[in-house]
């Protein structure tokens, strides 16, 4: 059984920097657990780690998809499991860094997601619920899931229509509750390090980071994606991109678009915190207000590795 560290928490809390520090300390390699950093050419809006930040630390599952490709939790699990085994075979420590909670859960709970390939039945089910969502709204679709599987609906925000539809797909295809999907026996031993901080501190960091993204060229990056038909592409759904599309169409001002990015980022951070705080085995630290906690984290990992 491989030992794996996962650094979790909301956006802008310092996961990338900590993952690199720990990789240096424990001879580790980093696996991105972010659903948007897989896309090539989308660097600024995804807060992708830079080559300068990486230094000599190997990073995986970054820049592996074109913008028109669909990247799913099933595909992530398959690739991440492969990388974990490869890294462990090199006698290095796999370190997962990222904020996509369900992606991490596929690994920690070893979820049986099945094939990543679409079939016609899946597409038909998905398109049906998409049409229902467009006609009656996201809350109505969530209520249908709530009637069928209250446990699953309690874990999925009403606003996350994509995951709600995914749950309805699974129920329809398998005849089983989404919350009762089978788990395989755990193959890896995970240590979850959670990063958090006071909400005003976090929100201020998010707002400043969005401003810095704009300064660093987010507008140009998003415009390129828009010109590639980004509104209809999987990569175009990401925060930092879809909020700018109405601006490019001349429907809102740049200030309004930027404020929407900040708002969506703050809401996303809140959802991330809620998700990870429900993981009872996460060990929480606030290295933004208490930088010396990094030493405590290192000692904590040292003790865990010896077990």
From Swiss-Prot:
InterPro entries: Dimethylallyltransferase, IPT, P-loop_NTPase. Belongs to the IPP transferase family. Residues 34-37 are annotated as: Interaction with substrate tRNA. Its cofactor is Mg(2+). Pfam families: IPPT. Its EC number is 2.5.1.75. ATP binds at residues 9-16. It comes from the Bacteria. Catalyzes the transfer of a dimethylallyl group onto the adenine at position 37 in tRNAs that read codons beginning with uridine, leading to the formation of N6-(dimethylallyl)adenosine (i(6)A). NCBIfam families: miaA (TIGR00174). Monomer. This is tRNA dimethylallyltransferase. The record marks 100, 126 as: Interaction with substrate tRNA. Substrate binds at residues 11-16. It catalyses: adenosine(37) in tRNA + dimethylallyl diphosphate = N(6)-dimethylallyladenosine(37) in tRNA + diphosphate. Keywords: ATP-binding, Magnesium, Nucleotide-binding, Transferase, tRNA processing.
């Amino acid at each position: 059984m491989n030992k794996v560290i996962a650094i979790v928490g909301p956006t802008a809390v310092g996961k990338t920097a900590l993952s690199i520090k720990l990789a240096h300390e424990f001879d580790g390699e980093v696996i991105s657990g972010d659903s948007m950093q897989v896309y090539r050419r989308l660097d600024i809006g995804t807060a992708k780690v830079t080559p300068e930040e990486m230094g000599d630390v190997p990073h995986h599952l970054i820049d592996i998809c074109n913008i028109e490709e669909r990247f799913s939790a099933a595909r992530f699990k398959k690739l991440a499991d492969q990388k974990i085994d490869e890294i462990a075979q090199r006698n290095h420590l796999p370190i997962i860094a990222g904020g996509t909670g369900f992606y991490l859960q596929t690994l920690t709970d070893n979820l049986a997601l099945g094939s990543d390939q679409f079939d016609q039945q899946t597409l038909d089910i998905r398109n049906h619920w998409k049409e229902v969502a467009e006609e009656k709204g996201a809350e109505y679709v969530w209520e249908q899931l709530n009637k069928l599987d209250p446990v699953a609906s309690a874990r999925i925000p009403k606003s996350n229509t994509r995951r709600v539809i995914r749950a309805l797909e699974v129920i329809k295809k398998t005849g089983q509750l989404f919350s009762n999907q089978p788990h395989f026996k755990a193959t890896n031993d995970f240590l979850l390090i959670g990063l958090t901080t006071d909400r005003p501190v976090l929100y201020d960091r998010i707002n400043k980071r969005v401003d810095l993204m704009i300064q660093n060229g987010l507008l140009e990056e998003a415009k390129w994606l828009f010109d590639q038909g980004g509104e209809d592409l999987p990569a175009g759904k990401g925060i930092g991109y879809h909020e700018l599309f109405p601006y490019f169409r001349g429907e809102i001002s740049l200030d309004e678009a930027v404020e929407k990015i900040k708002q969506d980022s703050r809401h996303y951070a809140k959802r991330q915190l809620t998700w990870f705080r429900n993981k009872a085995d996460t060990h929480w630290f606030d290295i933004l207000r208490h930088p010396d906690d990094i030493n405590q984290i290192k000692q904590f990992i040292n003790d865990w590795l010896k077990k």
